[in-house]
């Protein structure tokens, strides 16, 4: 009988071990291979993108990306708790990245809201207030980012922050030259009057510019130039789209 009680005690300890804590229902309900989780993440992002202040005229509606999700989950699984390289989060275009670490399973909506709340330290047209970090916010609302994919991992190798959240945004935002204006201020959808859904633009571009002066190059050299064919695809192929 005593032996049986000891075995029950050992079994109870195993149930509380770090290797199994991460598999509890609270964690598994956050896995992003579930359609309802994907919808929660996309809907929360679009809700917040609609609510920016001042309002934006060119903010794209976000959609789920399987490719971006695969990359985000791969990085989360490494449990390094730092940003990945740009190559690790590239699909056909480069993607940005937001990270979140937690001691306990946290709802995706709560995670995303925490990124958005950095707007309290952001002044449109000026940038971050002194000694403040706002990169999560600016990437979340970046006007041309429209594909999103996220992943979550349980990291027993970490002492405290055992839950690692990763979201990839494509195309990437936080362009240094535009970081104080992550979108164009104006009436919602003013930049896309014929491609609007509930205050967000739907005329997205699947290409990106790799040079900052593509518009002037298009005027001077034209899109048939070999340089523009490879470095200015958004400018040349997405003339009537947000990019």
From Swiss-Prot:
What does the record say about tissue specificity?
Testis.
Task: Give Gene Ontology CC terms.
Answer: extracellular region
SCP domain ranges (all copies): 42-169
Subcellular compartments: Secreted
Q: Which positions carry the signal peptide feature in this UniProt record?
A: 1-22
Write down the Gene3D superfamilies for this protein, in alphabetical order.
CAP, Crisp domain
What region holds the ShKT domain?
A: 205-238
Q: Which UniProt keywords apply?
A: Disulfide bond, Secreted, Signal
SUPFAM superfamilies xref list: Crisp domain-like, PR-1-like
What InterPro entries does the record point to? Allrgn_V5/Tpx1_CS, CAP_dom, CAP_sf, Crisp-like_dom, CRISP-related, Cysteine_rich_secretory, SCP_CRISP, ShKT_dom
Read off the Pfam families from this record.
Answer: CAP, Crisp
Q: Which family does it belong to?
A: Belongs to the CRISP family.
Q: How does it assemble?
A: Interacts with NSUN4 isoform 3.
Q: What does this protein do?
A: May regulate some ion channels' activity and thereby regulate calcium fluxes during sperm capacitation.
Name by which UniProt lists this protein: Cysteine-rich secretory protein 2
Which gene is the coding source of this polypeptide chain? Answer: Crisp2
């Amino acid at each position: 009988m005593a032996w049986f009680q000891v075995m029950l005690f050992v079994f109870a300890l195993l149930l509380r071990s770090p290797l199994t804590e991460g598999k509890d229902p609270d964690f598994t309900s956050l896995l992003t291979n579930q359609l309802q989780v994907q919808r929660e993440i996309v809907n929360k992002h679009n809700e917040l993108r609609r609510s920016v202040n001042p309002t934006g005229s060119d903010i794209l509606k976000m959609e789920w990306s399987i490719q971006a999700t695969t990359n985000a989950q791969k990085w989360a699984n490494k449990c390094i708790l730092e940003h990945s390289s740009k190559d690790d989060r590239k699909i056909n275009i480069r993607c940005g990245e937001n990270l979140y670490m937690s001691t306990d399973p946290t709802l995706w909506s709560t995670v995303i809201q925490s990124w958005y709340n950095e707007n309290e330290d952001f002044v449109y047209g000026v940038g971050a207030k002194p000694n403040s970090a706002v990169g999560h916010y600016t990437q979340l609302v970046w006007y041309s980012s429209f594909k999103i994919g996220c992943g979550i991992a349980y990291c027993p190798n970490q002492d405290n922050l055992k839950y690692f959240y990763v979201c990839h945004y494509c195309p990437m935002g936080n362009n240094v030259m535009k970081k104080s204006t992550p979108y164009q201020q104006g009436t919602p959808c003013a930049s896309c009057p014929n491609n609007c859904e509930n205050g967000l633009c739907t005329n997205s571009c699947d290409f990106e510019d790799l040079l900052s002066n593509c518009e002037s190059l298009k005027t001077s050299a034209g899109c048939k130039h070999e340089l523009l064919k490879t470095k200015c695809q958004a400018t040349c192929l997405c003339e009537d789209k947000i990019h």
